[in-house]
Amino acid sequence: MAGFGLPNFGQLTEAFKKAKQIQQDAQKLQDELENMEIEGESDDEMVKVWISGNQLPLRVEVQENILNSDKEKIEQNILQAIQKAHELSTTTMKERMNDLTGGLNLNLPGFDNTDS
């Protein structure tokens, strides 16, 4: 600490540099997630959905022969595909955020920032 209880100017400058780098990396990550397409598929592979890394629905693909199934079967397949895509998207987002914030111990809710 320098005089008057203020931090050393060099330390302050370094902290600002790190903050700016984190901000730039966070924007880059946001762009990557936005452009990412994550696929989820029903157990019987009759329905596929794609969502972005930000969990924005992008498209749905349904196999022709599922249209002969009953309403409940179609709904179940759609739900399975959405849930799988969402789970993969969430996992991907957490991993990328962890890579970005690793070692900073930011204690962000929902993100494990420890190396356990």
From Swiss-Prot:
User: What are the alphabetically sorted keywords of the record?
Assistant: Cytoplasm, DNA-binding
- Which cysteines does the record link by disulfide bonds? none
Taxonomically, the superkingdom here is Bacteria
What SUPFAM superfamilies does the record point to? YbaB-like
Pfam families named in the record: YbaB_DNA_bd
Output a single Gene Ontology CC term carried by this record: cytosol
Tell me the protein's name: Nucleoid-associated protein PMT9312_0020
State the species of origin.
Prochlorococcus marinus (strain MIT 9312)
Q: What is the lineage of its organism?
A: Bacteria, Bacillati, Cyanobacteriota, Cyanophyceae, Synechococcales
